């Protein structure tokens, strides 16, 4: 049986190991998952209360257009309902965009170290992928602009960026957008938008009024704590959203997910508290890194990235202590947890780096 040739160069997405899978390797004790940037505090209590009270007819298909949820999003963000597209997580939204826009001979431009699904779906559609190195962990928009050409159909900007947690500020993003042809779609992935505290972070929704080639992506999987429900959304001009709806699967978001997201979107107090606690958690890690001269990227998300050598060793040390983090070739990414969880990981990091220093001293004196 024949499939697309380009599939031979790709692998299925491999998520981080679950606590159950970790037990098979590291022993039968409890594990704290801090690898996938989920909300360690769960979702709004209102969601749990309402879902217990409500009744859904599970024999019926969901509202294919997610009308109530889209209207709720539109009302809060001051856009039209027709400007909102919902998907089964941002993964599906990214797939929809790629399928609708890309064809063989096109190219996309993005960063080297960023969310891998941009690249994945471009290759599936037979496109060239142009990746630009980060500049100190941040998207280099000047360099990205220099490699955009007439065949560039999408520029993907993850802001704040995953896995580094860094961001492009308002001035740089606005300047970049002004220099890109409206024939090129600029997708700004703001999955971690709710966690941002930087004063100069871009407010992208007003840009939609002036630029027809911008899409903004957000999700309920992170700050809202609804990752298992799989729901994300895009906001853009009506004409573009209408075309993306053509490739959207019928009934793509379950009734349960729509209801949970609608309730969660109205609980501003919950999000404010989550952001407050998350900011405190980031300060825990930042203080530790500064005191011990360990490099880190200033994060605007619910995780912190340490650009260090031997990320695999740090992963192993954390795993043996009951913490699941995400290793990378050039460092580790750690989801911010509860205060106690953060203290536990920091204790492991402290021991790891002390052992490393001791080993270096011993080798120097040998």
Curated annotation (Swiss-Prot):
It is an enzyme of class 2 (transferase). This is Histidinol-phosphate aminotransferase 2. Belongs to the class-II pyridoxal-phosphate-dependent aminotransferase family. Histidinol-phosphate aminotransferase subfamily. Gene3D superfamilies: Aspartate Aminotransferase, domain 1, Type I PLP-dependent aspartate aminotransferase-like (Major domain). It comes from Bacillus thuringiensis subsp. konkukian (strain 97-27). It holds the Pfam family Aminotran_1_2. Pathway: Amino-acid biosynthesis; L-histidine biosynthesis; L-histidine from 5-phospho-alpha-D-ribose 1-diphosphate: step 7/9. InterPro entries: Aminotrans_II_pyridoxalP_BS, Aminotransferase_I/II_large, HisP_aminotrans, HistidinolP_aminotransfase, PyrdxlP-dep_Trfase, PyrdxlP-dep_Trfase_major, PyrdxlP-dep_Trfase_small. Residues 1-11 have a biased composition (Polar residues). Keywords: Amino-acid biosynthesis, Aminotransferase, Histidine biosynthesis, Pyridoxal phosphate, Transferase. It catalyses: L-histidinol phosphate + 2-oxoglutarate = 3-(imidazol-4-yl)-2-oxopropyl phosphate + L-glutamate. One of its GO terms (molecular function) is histidinol-phosphate transaminase activity. Residues 1-21 are annotated as: Disordered. The keyword DNA-binding does not apply. Its cofactor is pyridoxal 5'-phosphate. The modification N6-(pyridoxal phosphate)lysine is found at residue 222. Its EC number is 2.6.1.9. Homodimer. One of its GO terms (biological process) is L-histidine biosynthetic process. NCBIfam families: hisC.
